Amino acid sequence: MEDERWKLSSSKGRSKSGRSCSSSSNYYYHSSDFNSSNATTLSRSYSASVTASRHATTAWSAAGAGGGGASSSSSSQHQHQQQQQQSNNSQRLSKKCVEAVKEHRARFYIVRRCVSMLVCWRDY
């Protein structure tokens, strides 16, 4: 039995200009292809989660600051640890982006060489 959800309907296979696209060349998904809960999950960025944790940290430190000297030093240590975690997370994220760019360049270089080889081979 074939799964119907993987088949392209005639409306999804056509662009706004009316030209049809083959399923093999359609690499990008439209936001209407996903349900609303997945769309909100995919649209959130890393910075949104960082700002949410930052607001929770300031609320916690404000509540603990009035308790005395021990709790305020503990809250400042906690804030320092969270700032280090956030900087480590951003460094990891930027490292992943750099690695992805390098991999993309390497793949593009290989494809370019293959295409030039095929073009030269066809000329012979």
From Swiss-Prot:
Transmembrane in keyword set: yes
Positions annotated as glycosylated: N35, N38, N88
Localization annotation: Cell membrane
Gene Ontology annotations for the cellular component aspect, listed alphabetically: plasma membrane
UniProt keyword terms in alphabetical order: Cell membrane, Developmental protein, Glycoprotein, Membrane, Transmembrane, Transmembrane helix
Membrane topology type: Single-pass membrane protein
Region (Disordered): 1-23, 60-95
TM segment ranges: 59-75
UniProt region (Required for DVL/RTFL small polypeptide activity), positions on chain: 92-124
InterPro entries assigned to the protein according to its UniProt record, in alphabetical order: DVL, DVL_RTFL_regulatory
Bias (Low complexity) ranges: 71-91
Primary localization: membrane
Pfam family, one: DVL
UniProt GO BP: negative regulation of cell population proliferation; regulation of cell population proliferation; shoot system development
PANTHER family: DVL19-RELATED-RELATED
Family: Belongs to the DVL/RTFL small polypeptides family.
Function: Small polypeptide acting as a regulatory molecule which coordinates cellular responses required for differentiation, growth and development, probably by restricting polar cell proliferation in lateral organs (e.g. leaves and petioles).
The name this protein goes by in its record: Small polypeptide ROTUNDIFOLIA LIKE 3
Species in which this protein is naturally found: Oryza sativa subsp. japonica (Rice)
